[in-house]
Structures are given as C-alpha cells and as structure tokens.
Amino acid sequence: MGEARKNWNPQQALNGQSQVSRVQLNHASELLQSMDPALHQASHDPFGAQAMVFTLLLSQQEDGCREQMSALEENGHAALVQEMGRLLPHIRAMDARTKLPLVDLAIPSLRQLSPAQFEAFSQTLQWLIESDQQIDLFEFALQKVVERHLRHHFVAQSRQAPSHHVILPLLPHAQVLISGFAHIGHDQAAATQLAFERGIAQLGELGKKLTLLPFDQCNLPQMNEAIEHLNLATPGLRQRIIFSLAHTVGADGSVTLKEAELLRAFADALDCPIPPHVDTPIETQPT
C-alpha cells in the first residue's frame, strides 16, 4: 500500500495562485486548532521557532537523532538542544500534513532574528539537512520555503531580468522537472509515462518531442539545477512550467502529500507560489 492520496484538480489548484478559497481558509483554521499547543507556542518565539524547525529535520532513527543532538550541543547550542528535546515528542506525534504549515507559522518569528542570527540559523539548517548524507522530499521542500520567505527578507536580492522569452531553450530543463515529478509520484512504468505525457502536453507541440528521462537523470539535485535555468524565464513561462507540473502530479486525479509539498516547493522556487492543496483524503492506494 502506498501513501494516502487526495483528490486533485490541476486547474482548481492553480486558480488558487491568485485567490485563497474558503475551503483553504477553513482548512488552515482547522490545522491551527488541531495543532499541539506546545508547538503553536514555540512558533511565536524566535528561539522556539528555530528549535522547532531544527527538530523537524532530526533523523527518524534514534541513534542518528542522538548523534545530531550531541553534535549541536558540542558546538555550543546546549540551550537549543534542550528546547529541541522538549519539542521532540510533540513533533514525533504530529500529523505529517501539518509540518509545512507549522514552518509557515514560524516564519514571522524567524524574521525577527538579527542578520547574524539568521546566518547561524541557516548554517545549522543546512548542516542538519546534509548530516545524514541525503536529502528527502520534506527537507527539500522546507529548504525552498526558507529560501523564499526568509533569505529574501534578510538578503537584498533583485530578480535578474528575464533572458528567456520563448519556451524552446527551456525545454531540456522542463523535461528534467516533469520527468522527476512523474517518477516521484508513480512506481509503475505505465503510470509514470502517462504522468509525463500529461505534463508535457501543457507545453504545446514542442513539448511532445520530449521523452521521459530515467530517474538518475532527474533526481532532486538535477531538478534543483533546472530551477536555476528556469528562473531566468518570464513570469508567464515560469507559470506555464508550474502548470505542466500540476498536470503531471494530477495525471491520475489524485495527489499524495509528498507530491503536493514538492509542487509547492518548486512553485515557491520559481516565484509562482500556490496555496497548499486541501481536499478530502481518499482511500489509500498503491503509488
């Protein structure tokens, strides 16, 4: 059995780019009401917010978690480790769907850090992500949320003028993203191929010439590299890429939590943010 899936309509999801629906507002309210009070309280304090985000990144393996906490303590973060230890059981017990919303809740508090504190926070965040020698989908999504909503706040950055005004030179990079999303969301070859075809169909006739890449040519580092190129496109082209990814995700009419989080991360990275997808979970299906 695979991850629980939700109903998914790409067009409705992307309509949310410009308007948050009543359903989404109600869902956000429900998430806040169901959130552990200890985590909710921590999110409203800069120190607690840092500890909470770091705790979300701790290894699920007991030995790995202990090693990470010890390393942080040895590097002068004893108070932080103590707070992380207090929050850990609350983090472990939380609904996975509330993890990114919890990070969102912490953003205003994290913006209260000084530039030096933010730099220290960023370094620790990166160390925790890399400490297990691999990056999972949640870590990647969290990293993109932090980059968009925090780094841009502390580090003045002006978006480079678009150098791509047509889709043609972007197709190889779009191919990497669409292939990656197709593989991540589906285990069966036929379903993966269908998802890829639904995605490239949104790119017009030129897109139909693209072929599905093997997963070792479209993993997260390669997808991240593709984003760097796609960010040089006009807003309309970037939104078109996100539209293609939404159709890749929704090829089977449903979406898993990891697919929804990854889509949100890439939409943030391309400066085409979309609100979290909410719908009624349906029966768990093989993915």
Task: Name what the model sees in each region.
Residues 1-130, 138-287:
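Small-residue-enriched hydrophobic alpha-helices in membranes
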